[in-house]
């Protein structure tokens, strides 16, 4: 026996009524430019205008939810045809730019087969324009995290605050 609940239309219009929260307007996001894992600049507005945009905030040293999120995004990404991929922009933005430089992000991208844009910054000094930009991105998307001092290289403690965002 093979069952596909919810996947077959009953033909009854009453069964097709939308259940959920209708999103009528998106969140306003500041324009920004960050650095890709290929060490090129990425203009958010230019690359996402007119597209559905899927953004994940994560870090490569995470052994908790980040690989799961990446796997799920990869599954979705791989299920889309070229026409759909032209209308959807997938982006990963690091929350650990001190560790996730372009080389590390590119290694992560290749090892996880997450073949979409991964973003970081070059200058992680607190007073740098790069960090000001990245901090503004985190603030715009209400990304919450806590920086904790590591006592060992293997310390992967992190606080994740998953949420979803609608961008216009």
Features from the language model and the residues they span:
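Structural microenvironment flanking redox-active thiols in thiol-disulfide oxidoreductases
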Residues: 70-137
């Amino acid at each position: 026996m093979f069952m596909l609940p919810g996947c077959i239309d009953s033909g009854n219009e009453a069964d097709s009524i939308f259940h959920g929260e209708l999103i009528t307007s998106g969140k306003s996001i500041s324009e920004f430019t960050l650095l890709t894992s290929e060490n090129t600049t990425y203009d958010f507005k230019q690359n996402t205008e007119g597209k559905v945009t899927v953004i994940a905030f994560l870090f490569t040293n995470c052994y908790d939810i980040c690989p799961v999120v990446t796997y799920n995004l990869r599954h979705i990404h791989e299920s889309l045809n070229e026409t759909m991929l032209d209308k959807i922009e997938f982006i990963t933005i690091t929350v650990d730019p001190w560790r996730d430089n372009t080389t590390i992000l590119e290694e992560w991208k290749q090892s996880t087969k997450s073949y979409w844009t991964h973003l970081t910054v070059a200058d992680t000094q607190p007073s740098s324009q790069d960090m000001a930009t990245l901090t503004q991105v985190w603030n715009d998307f209400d990304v919450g995290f806590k920086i904790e001092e590591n006592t060992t290289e293997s310390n992967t403690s992190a606080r994740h605050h998953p949420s979803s965002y609608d961008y216009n």
